[in-house]
């Protein structure tokens, strides 16, 4: 891994720490069952909404295996489908357990800042934005594109905020509602650990020039900065606008001048 890619992974790690700070701020105060329903409904949406577009992509790409689509990439997409399905099931089961009510997709929340995150990702890779959010229409032609490799790798490096939410929730106390939350998100975290270096590995052969580095850093900052606003909204704004801006500024400072 070259020096510039190490700097990009450092940048993504700084944003992961910033995202963790938001989640920590929420859990710093005592919370009742009702306090958890909104953020869990939003998280369940994020997991569930990826299932259909990945399934559709797999069906469309199947005839292209070893022709236009590498079999290893196809396998990776099948693993992602399995993970997202499992994670959606875990979070929705948790919602039912806490609320005492049957939960279906119509009960989940797609919040405004998450919608904005989808739009920002779509500026750089419409196909990846669709796979991650379930928004838009996916096509085999879009997935086969070879002219947005850096963009896709940079987005991958930011995906899930580096597991920030899962990490914080997995470390909650072991009893009561928080104990149930901790168990579910620890299970999800274990799945995410296997993918944690995929963005860096994808960027390694692509970032060859200063322009490549600047492009990737710009995408990481834009996507990750919006992730902070998304996460703060999801948890009911535990941090003020100024506090959020300071987290963003500090994270960007991880690679001063991006050079």
Show the residue positions of the predicted features.
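Non-heme di-metal
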Residues: 1-259
């Amino acid at each position: 891994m070259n020096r510039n890619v190490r700097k990009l992974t450092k940048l993504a790690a700084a944003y992961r720490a910033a995202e963790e700070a938001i989640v920590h701020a929420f859990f710093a105060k005592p919370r009742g069952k009702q306090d958890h329903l909104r953020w869990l409904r939003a998280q369940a949406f994020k997991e569930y909404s990826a299932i259909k577009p990945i399934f559709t992509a797999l069906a469309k790409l199947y005839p292209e295996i070893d022709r236009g689509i590498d079999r290893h990439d196809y396998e990776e997409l099948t693993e992602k489908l399995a993970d997202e399905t499992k994670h959606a099931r875990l979070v929705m089961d948790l919602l039912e357990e806490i609320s005492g009510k049957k939960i279906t997709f119509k009960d989940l929340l797609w919040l405004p800042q998450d919608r904005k995150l989808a739009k920002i990702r779509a500026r750089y890779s419409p196909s990846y934005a669709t796979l991650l959010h379930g928004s838009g229409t996916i096509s085999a032609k879009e997935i086969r594109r070879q002219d947005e490799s850096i963009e896709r790798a940079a987005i991958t490096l930011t995906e899930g905020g580096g597991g920030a939410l899962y990490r914080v929730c997995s470390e909650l106390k072991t009893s009561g509602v928080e104990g149930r939350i901790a168990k579910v998100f620890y299970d999800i975290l274990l799945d995410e650990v296997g993918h944690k270096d995929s963005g860096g590995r994808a960027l390694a052969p692509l970032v060859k020039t200063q322009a490549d580095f600047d492009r990737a850093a710009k995408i990481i900052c834009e996507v990750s900065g919006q992730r902070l606003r998304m996460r703060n909204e999801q948890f009911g704004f535990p941090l003020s606008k100024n506090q959020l801006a300071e987290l963003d500024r500090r994270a960007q400072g991880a690679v001063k001048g991006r050079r």
